[in-house]
Amino acid sequence: MVKKLNLFISLILVIAVKGEDVETAVNKILPPGMQVQAIADSNIDGIKVVDIGELQPIYVTEDGKYFFYGELYSINESSINNLTDQAKRDKRADLIASNLSSADYITFPAKRAKHEITVFTDVDCGYCRKFHSEIEDYNEIGITVNYVAFPRSGPDSSSYNKIVGAWCSADPKKILTEQKKGEEPKISMCEDNPVMEHFMLGQKIGITGTPAIISKSGALFPGYLPASDLFSRLEASES
């Protein structure tokens, strides 16, 4: 969908739409199946932030005549802030909160949790295995890890079926751990599993590789990070 939208926008960026209300104007130029979800004021007078159901918003003039699709920055005395990145973080956090519950996760809790993360994982991913081999380090430092499934090879693949087996197990933590050690524990399949929903959610919020670590505030940390480094980044992102 993102590629489709990027291609579509590349064709119409130089075209101004007729003056009309923002929602009507934007809906007319969106690809089929997409529509405006929400409209909010931006930090710039006369510019609206428009949520079109993707992670990336678009920015539209109040009269609906012009828009741009890209990064919006604010310039302060001593820094430059990426306002679009903050909007993406907020959107990620909202999508995770509204689509996932505790029943969706395979959770490895910290005894004294200071941070809680959502980790999109694949049982056959090398760095996912490395991350999980250090799960006690993350828990010990105060990070609760909530795993969700993101089999990179997609539905009906070996990795997909393996991770479905973990979620269907009577002891998901045990099976997931064994799989990430390269073992092949006996698994059972079930229809009532959240793996496809996890996979589709990951695609919607822009996950392209694993492990993909997301903080409670929606900050994305792609790839493996040692416990101490991750903790430092979480502290900085939540401050």
Each language-model region and where it sits:
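Short, non-transmembrane alpha-helical segments in secretory-pathway proteins
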Residues: 18-35
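Extended, non-globular interaction scaffolds
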Residues: 85-88
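Hydrophobic h-region of N-terminal signal peptides that target proteins for export
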Residues: 10-18
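Sec-dependent signal peptide recognition
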Residues: 2-10
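Structural microenvironment flanking redox-active thiols in thiol-disulfide oxidoreductases
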Residues: 137-168
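A short beta-strand-turn-helix
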Residues: 97-115
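Short active-site neighborhood of thiol/selenol oxidoreductases, capturing the structured segment around
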Residues: 109-129, 145
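Thiol/selenol-based redox catalytic cores and closely related redox-interacting motifs
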Residues: 35-38, 45-51, 56-59, 63-80, ...
